[in-house]
Amino acid sequence: MSKNVVVIGTQWGDEGKGKIVDWLAESVQGVVRFQGGHNAGHTLWINGKKTILRLIPSGIMHPGVTCYIGNGVVLSPEALLKEIEELEAAGLDVRSRLQISEICPLILPYHVAVDKAREARKGESKIGTTGRGIGPAYEDKVARRALRVQDLFTPDIFDAKLDEVLDYHNFVLTQYLGAQAVSANEVRDQAMALAPAIKPMVRDVSSSIFLAQQQGARFLFEGAQGALLDVDHGTYPYVTSSNCVAGAASAGAGVGPQSLDYVLGITKAYTTRVGSGPFPTELLDEVGSRLATVGKEFGSVTGRPRRCGWFDGAALKRSVRLNGISGLCITKLDVLDGLEKLQLGVGYRVNGEFRDVLPYGAHAVAQAEPVLEELPGWSESTVGVTEYSKLPLNARRYLERVAEVCGVPIDLVSTGPDRNETIVLRHPLKG
């Protein structure tokens, strides 16, 4: 029986992690975000009502669960408070159940300005960021010039750090990117105005989790984006700016690796990608359009259409190795309903040689020609099915082949957006 579970996206994000974290949260006492920022969009459907969470962990929908934003997250005070107000307007108690690490790096207006100016300058060669300042905020962290949450409550320190970092960013904005400078006074005034609302939620999150675990509390560690967007292991440079793999939960939440008992990998029954970057199994035909339409494949944060393709088992195999995945959750199986034939990626041809795992780097992936295996589809509906035996025979065969190619058992199958539309083969927290 696992006490603590890490939930990771195994593809290029948008795998349906939010629903699964929300479903699992009823069995834990705490849910922790450990990387990313408000570029993540976790969509939950509960009793037919849609909720999108960007910063706040998906466990916030459960009254008895405490939610934590760990030090690995880059935090926009403005975005955080807006999200809190939206949830409170829906009747949720948020502030008494949310703890924010005092050492989270802040996202401030100059990060957004730099992010947008860079993408505009790159034109067609742009990475495809969300334009929310995530990358520049992580750059400041690594360059040791970041302002952090704790700095909001010591104005003298905040001012000194702000003047120094803004000298740098305004030079880049005006002299290199050809954009307007950002006003230090405006940044300072906005931050100081928001600080009092944030202060009651600020904690030493690492210690809070440690002490709760000593009392027997169970935790979910909620990943954002997906392993193939990891800044080290993804299709670099078409990646996000943080580590999205399971190992990042330890550093990004401030917990020891022995606290992580089980890794649940979330994957769609097909593959999607937002923005630029190589995508070996991408479909540019009617089938791809059908997957996008039926699957409602539009980004929950940006609204951008997602590119769609066949399930890529060789890419998933890379995620399995990177994350030490204990079991898989297959989402959006119902989107494949009605397709007469399916294709499943089992490897690639790279310079005439067969490879059974996604190569490293965007250039190498762009050269990879997918090796596809054809499987029969099914005409029956899988929407809302909650028992594995009631799935169509060919749907079960498809899932079995997915598990075989990836080398990991399937523990959960999602057959619809609502938390109850889930097939449980093995419960990650109950064995």
Curated annotation (Swiss-Prot):
It is found in: Cytoplasm. GO terms for biological process: 'de novo' AMP biosynthetic process; IMP metabolic process. The keyword Hydrolase does not apply. InterPro entries: Adenylosuccin_syn_GTP-bd, Adenylosuccin_syn_Lys_AS, Adenylosuccinate_synth_dom1, Adenylosuccinate_synth_dom2, Adenylosuccinate_synth_dom3, Adenylosuccinate_synthetase, P-loop_NTPase. Belongs to the adenylosuccinate synthetase family. It catalyses: IMP + L-aspartate + GTP = N(6)-(1,2-dicarboxyethyl)-AMP + GDP + phosphate + 2 H(+). The keyword Flavoprotein does not apply. Homodimer. This is Adenylosuccinate synthetase. IMP binds at D14, E15, G16, K17, N39, A40, G41, H42, T130, R144, Q225, T240, R304. Mg(2+) binds at D14, G41. Its EC number is 6.3.4.4. Pfam families: Adenylsucc_synt (PF00709). Binds 1 Mg(2+) ion per subunit. Plays an important role in the de novo pathway of purine nucleotide biosynthesis. Catalyzes the first committed step in the biosynthesis of AMP from IMP. Keywords: Cytoplasm, GTP-binding, Ligase, Magnesium, Metal-binding, Nucleotide-binding, Purine biosynthesis. It comes from the Bacteria. Substrate binds at S300, V301, T302, G303, R304, P305, R306. The active site is at D14 (proton acceptor), H42 (proton donor). PANTHER family: ADENYLOSUCCINATE SYNTHETASE. One of its GO terms (molecular function) is adenylosuccinate synthase activity.
